[in-house]
């Protein structure tokens, strides 16, 4: 009792005292320490996600599929709202690197693969593939997933599925893996060995109206063509050889690309880039050009479609010159494609197309002038480099067109307002000195169609007309 009274007196008197018991704060209850330790042990890596909760969710998934196996073989797996919600949480969690690694260590890919193989529920399949897709966003887990040959086989088979969300997640996962340099060769080899992949992608492009799916399939195909030229040659050759890919009237690769591009034109025009690039890549190999030329109707259809894009959608007269910066990724493959087709199909050049080519060079000149006036060369150096290929392609194509130009077409261009003094000077400045012959032919025609403009070009650029041309 005395000891207790002394302690009270010391505290009341603000004295620290000498007793060890009074030199420290009271210890927390032991159960709080244990709770904190348990929570730390249960956390996945540096996250707040619970290992126990994740184990429980995956266990419920396994149990649900196991129970389903005991029922009719053709029945759909019943996915409860609660389990679907929890699996979607796992899907989101898998975007965290610590969670992705933990799922890999816990053999979650094998569990998900088993569910995909046994499930007849499209939503469940979509979620499982989506989880794997998020896991593949990290290098180490992507490498591990790619080494699973069974998973690779199942994913390629899923390209033949008829559920758009599942197809979307499958394409996303494949594209993610193909973007990893370490594992891309593994996936390319698998795809080369599965001829059904080509027909599956063609079927999607030619029949689907799902914009997100068409965009992702286009990105996947463009990546495949960009990474493996031999695969591209094989697919375009097989599509036009009447062999196994065509036995069931399956669409060929060219018509499928065109059909998907038409679908996206109004829905998602920015997504046309990958389709235009894929078509342009086909013109860089002999097999691709042969397919376009031998099937003249398809080649002409591609020409007509891309001309419409250029003349009606891209880089229009009422657009500001800066539109060239926004649309350069679309314009570059489009013009390269048109240039290749023109030289092989000897297509007709309309006044509208000629006007579009001139306008691109005019907008480029105006952008360059504004950058110079604003002393902003440094800030636009990268953009100028990106535009270089577009301007060169446009100039080369325009040169070829001008060398074949007839007076009636030029007259139509002038009357429609596509060729003013400003646009003509801009175009000629881009064409010289590499394409002098084309400029001479233009000046020669202008001497009859618009003598004043002809004299301006002669004077400004010291160009003489070439009447013999």
Swiss-Prot record:
State the superkingdom.
Eukaryota
* Presence of the UniProt keyword Nucleus in the record: yes
Note the InterPro entries from the entry. ARM-like, ARM-type_fold, Synovial_Prolif_Regulator
Record field: compositional bias (Acidic residues): 30-39
* Keywords carried by this UniProt record: Nucleus
Q: Where is this region: Disordered?
A: 1-39
Task: Please tell me whether the keyword Signal is annotated for this protein.
Answer: no
Q: Where does it sit, as one GO cellular component term?
A: nucleoplasm
Record-level GO BP terms: positive regulation of synoviocyte proliferation
Q: Which Gene3D superfamilies match?
A: Leucine-rich Repeat Variant (1.25.10.10)
Instruction: Report the locations given in the UniProt record.
Output: Nucleus
What is this protein for, i.e. what is its function?
Plays a role in promoting cell proliferation in response to pro-inflammatory stimuli.
Q: Which family does it belong to?
A: Belongs to the SAAL1 family.
What is the name listed in the Swiss-Prot or TrEMBL entry for this protein? Answer: Protein saal1
Q: Which organism is it from?
A: Danio rerio (Zebrafish)
The uppermost taxa in this organism's lineage are:
Eukaryota, Metazoa, Chordata, Craniata, Vertebrata
Report the gene name: saal1
């Amino acid at each position: 009792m005395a000891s207790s009274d002394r302690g009270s007196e010391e505290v009341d008197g603000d004295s620290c005292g000498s007793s060890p018991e009074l030199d420290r704060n009271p210890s927390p209850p032991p159960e709080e320490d244990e709770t904190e330790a348990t929570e730390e042990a249960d956390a996945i890596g540096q996250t707040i996600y619970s290992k126990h909760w994740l184990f429980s969710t995956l266990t419920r998934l396994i149990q649900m599929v196991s129970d389903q196996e005991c029922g009719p073989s053709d029945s759909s797996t019943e996915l409860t709202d609660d389990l679907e919600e929890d699996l979607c949480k796992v899907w989101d969690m898998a975007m965290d690197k610590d969670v992705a690694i933990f799922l890999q260590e816990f053999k979650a890919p094998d569990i998900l693969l088993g569910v995909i193989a046994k499930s007849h529920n499209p939503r469940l399949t979509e979620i499982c593939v989506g989880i794997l897709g998020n896991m593949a966003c990290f290098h180490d887990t992507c490498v591990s997933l790619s080494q699973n040959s069974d998973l690779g086989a199942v994913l390629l088979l899923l390209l033949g599925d008829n559920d758009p969300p599942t197809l979307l997640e499958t394409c996303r996962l494949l594209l993610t893996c193909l973007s990893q340099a370490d594992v891309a060769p593994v996936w390319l080899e698998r795809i080369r060995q599965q001829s059904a992949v080509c027909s599956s992608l063609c079927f999607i492009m030619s029949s689907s109206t799902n914009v997100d799916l068409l965009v992702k399939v286009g990105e996947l195909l463009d990546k495949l063509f960009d990474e493996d030229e031999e695969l591209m040659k094989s697919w375009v050759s097989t599509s036009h050889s009447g062999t196994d890919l065509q036995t069931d009237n399956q669409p060929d690769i060219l018509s499928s690309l065109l059909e998907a591009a038409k679908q996206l034109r109004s829905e998602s025009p920015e997504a046309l880039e990958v389709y235009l690039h894929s078509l342009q890549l086909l013109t860089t190999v002999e097999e691709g050009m042969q397919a376009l030329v031998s099937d003249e109707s398809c080649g002409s259809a591609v020409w007509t479609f891309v001309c419409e894009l250029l003349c009606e959608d891209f880089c229009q007269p009422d657009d500001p010159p800066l539109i060239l910066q926004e649309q350069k990724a679309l314009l570059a493959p489009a013009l390269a494609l048109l240039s290749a087709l023109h030289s092989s199909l000897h297509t007709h050049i309309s006044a509208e197309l000629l006007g579009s080519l001139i306008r691109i060079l005019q907008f480029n000149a105006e952008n360059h002038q504004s950058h110079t006036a604003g002393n902003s060369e440094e800030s636009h150096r990268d953009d100028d480099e990106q535009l270089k290929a577009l301007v060169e392609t446009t100039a080369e194509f325009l040169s070829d067109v001008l060398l074949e130009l007839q007076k009636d077409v030029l007259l139509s261009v002038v009357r429609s307002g596509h060729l003013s003094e400003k646009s003509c000077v801009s175009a000629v400045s881009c064409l010289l000195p590499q394409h002098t012959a084309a400029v001479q032919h233009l000046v020669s025609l202008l001497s009859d169609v618009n003598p004043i403009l002809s004299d301006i070009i002669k004077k400004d650029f010291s160009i003489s007309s070439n009447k013999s041309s």
